[in-house]
């Protein structure tokens, strides 16, 4: 009687139209209910309604009043949380195939089917890639997924690597090589094999793409400067533009440096052998001559040439640093020529560091954390590694070479792949201005600093560098970390632009063509200038891919590290060890910190900071946490923490204050 009744349908529509409609993101909980997070309000989603949605779904909902409380009734799906996702295989009590999503806030099992292309027999706990096929709000059916790819078995010790690479759509395999690599670049090359080039890398490095030679410049028997010769491996001499290797390199963009092993951008026989600037081997190279005065100022325009070079020594960072620091039983150079190059490079580096300190910006010294792994992938130890003098020697030479390349490309090619950074994000400029005044000004200097840190001044390279130099004098990690939140992201651009992070007017990398596709592109442009050929501007889609690949690689490295940290610290939970930690973030839910001994991330819940949550106030502008009105914790503070719990399934490490 009521079926297909137009009056009833009209009444239902009127009732529906009379209800408030909202859009928001579903937030799950550890209970059956959830919440709909809207711009300015949060609505309760009852358990029955939560069965239609998943944490992270963007939906439209109707707001109903039940008793005296508002609650959300999911109405339409705008954007699902899941499309392609990582999961673990599960079989229910009826032996039906299901998947458990690898996400800390999604715990419901989803029915699944196996794609015919998968040849492995799936077992409980296996890691897989799946896609969501049906969604209750979109398809009027229950959640259902299709397993598209087998990743690895549950017990595979290398799961952190294989799962993370699959999550971000990256290959675990190197690029397929060729049977032979004839040199396609037949242009004339200078013979520079007599110069005493040296390489300085990690002891285990095979893909050596830069070698250095330095000599003093004399006038009337007095030294007036330095002549640095930077030789860079030339893979484009072997790789045709239309080759499969070129296309693979363009897609990968970077060598992926992971804990324990690397996934090279180029075939290993190119990156580790044919192109690598190995000791005593003659190699084609792109070479740059750079002249400076004794204070590090560039005095002549750089000169690029194609050449053949021969590295005379493969040196290791730690050996060279030990030698220069006069460590006990330190390594010694094999001959006077190597010793001379090391000493000259050391002197040159001191001048360049001082030049950058005055005219640009220096990096804040922070350690890198290195995982020491057993053959099966288990973590044996984690070491904090600081940049020593030998690292700085190579770094200063590379930075100088990249400065020269930027201005050379700008002048001669009128294009390139430039590394740029525009400082503060435009939408945060006013906030950065106010923060600086609030933190640094008083009655005596307010007028001066209002001009010094004006929005207009902070948008200029000179004004930004001036501000950073002011901050460095205060030696405040808090100011450094808080201001970092106002910065925009670094970008690749086809035209020269400042790099505020480095404090430079132009920067274009070309010194790592074995490891970076952008450097290969810049090589081709420089070589086009040298051979008087047309310089073709890189296409826009390449810049999009470079940005995405850089972001993906950082996420892959972070996700693997988080997993390994959990495995490493899980064995120590019972001992409840204590650590020094630096506060990295301040949130209403608690503090995020980094353990200084090993770099592990840890979360300190607010409930463990103070037993009365009403006594805790978090200022989201200054990123400080106060207890009963008094600021107790802020970004950059060093605090003592204790390990409480590790949950490998969610890659979370929880601690408390000591």
Curated annotation (Swiss-Prot):
Record SMART domains: CSP, RNB
Every S1 motif domain range: 576-658
Catalytic activity: Exonucleolytic cleavage in the 3'- to 5'-direction to yield nucleoside 5'-phosphates
Entry-linked Pfam families: OB_RNB, RNB, S1
EC number in record: 3.1.13.1
One of the protein's GO biological processes: mRNA catabolic process
Compartmental location: Cytoplasm
GO molecular-function terms, A-Z: exoribonuclease II activity; RNA binding
GO CC terms of this entry: cytosol
Domain of life of the native organism: Bacteria
The protein's enzyme class: hydrolase
PROSITE patterns to which the protein is assigned, alphabetical: RIBONUCLEASE_II, S1
Keywords: Cytoplasm, Exonuclease, Hydrolase, Nuclease, RNA-binding
RNB domain segment(s): 189-531
Family: Belongs to the RNR ribonuclease family. RNase II subfamily.
Role description: Involved in mRNA degradation. Hydrolyzes single-stranded polyribonucleotides processively in the 3' to 5' direction.
Protein known as: Exoribonuclease 2
Source organism per UniProt: Pasteurella multocida (strain Pm70)
Lineage: Bacteria, Pseudomonadati, Pseudomonadota, Gammaproteobacteria, Pasteurellales
